[in-house]
Amino acid sequence: MRVAVDAMGGDNAPVVEVEGAVAAAGEFGIPVTLVGDTDRVNQELAKYNCKGLDITVKHASEVVGMHDSASDAVRKKKDSSIRVAFDLVKNDEAVAVVSAGNSGATMAAGMFVLKRLKGIDRPAIAQIFPTLRGKTLVLDVGGNVDCKPLHLVQFAIMGEVYARFVMGVDNPRIGLLSNGEEESKGNDLTRETSALLKNTSLDYFGYVEGRDIFNGIVDVVVCDGFVGNVVLKLSEGLAEAVGKMLKDEIKQSLLSKIGYLLSRKAFVNFKKKVDYSEYGGAPLLGIDGVGMICHGGSNAKAIKNAIRFAHEYAQKGVNQRMAEKLQENYPLYMQQLEMLKVQAAG
């Protein structure tokens, strides 16, 4: 099962993409196709001993930049590295795409080339967060800034399946992000979504607050892409700031430095737990295929792990399970949605 990597996406392309691909092929035995400028990609590959590694290169003459519109990836730049990568999946030459490029363009290309899963109106970008009890999946973290209750219910179903079959959670609990735990809190979007979620087969916990993401009281947290992206960027900034503050404090005295040396293993383990590169990338859920969106500043380790997770996602047939779960729940939440419409009209 081959993974296609957008070798020209991201701040450090194609350097980190090539290094990450070589590492994934070497450590995990995953076949990889690097998509991009053949000359530049081969120049980077020449730095490594790739003997015995299943790595191929597919030429793409165009690149979608970070400031290009999402539509450019689909309509204007048909030979862009991200578009060609998804074409490989469509033509059964790969099972997944990994890209650290323009996330909007990646999402648009995935939807245009591979289409959406049956029962999905809008795909969502999901992100794993480290918690006090393990891990929590949050979605949407940036794919859709304006959502309807129906979209959030679909996000919850996709998140439940991903948590169960990729994260290994036996019975995932679903929480809806709000400004308080009480049912009286929230806005029209969360209140209507909550009513729909209660009418599904999911283990719906109810409202959760922002702090609960890191407490780990639920396994999946659902929100619209506007709120989710704020949560994501806030957590990234906080982790970076805390790390710098800690370093500054350690430098203040000899005693602090000695304390750090004695506790170094704990610090290393903590850093590993909050390091985004450990999780690779954010899965694009809801397209009829596998797409992994990486941070624009991803290092080789992040690319390597994104390839691993994308390969695992495809291996486990998660999309088929999502389609089945969506079909199972469709009549349940649609019945409730019709009731809410009648109440609103009356």
Curated annotation (Swiss-Prot):
Catalytic activities: a fatty acyl-[ACP] + phosphate = an acyl phosphate + holo-[ACP]
Keyword annotations: Cytoplasm, Lipid biosynthesis, Lipid metabolism, Phospholipid biosynthesis, Phospholipid metabolism, Transferase
Gene Ontology BP term (one): fatty acid biosynthetic process
A Pfam family this chain is assigned to: FA_synthesis
Compartment(s) of residence: Cytoplasm
EC number: 2.3.1.274
Descriptive protein name: Phosphate acyltransferase
Domain of life the protein comes from: Bacteria
Family from the record: Belongs to the PlsX family.
Taxonomic classification: Bacteria, Pseudomonadati, Thermodesulfobacteriota, Desulfuromonadia, Geobacterales
GO CC, one annotated term: cytoplasm
PANTHER family, A to Z: FATTY ACID/PHOSPHOLIPID SYNTHESIS PROTEIN PLSX, PHOSPHATE ACYLTRANSFERASE
Quaternary structure annotation from Swiss-Prot or TrEMBL: Homodimer. Probably interacts with PlsY.
Biological role stated in the UniProt entry: Catalyzes the reversible formation of acyl-phosphate (acyl-PO(4)) from acyl-[acyl-carrier-protein] (acyl-ACP). This enzyme utilizes acyl-ACP as fatty acyl donor, but not acyl-CoA.
Gene3D superfamilies: Isopropylmalate Dehydrogenase (3.40.718.10)
The protein's annotated pathway: Lipid metabolism; phospholipid metabolism
GO terms for MF: phosphate:acyl-[acyl carrier protein] acyltransferase activity
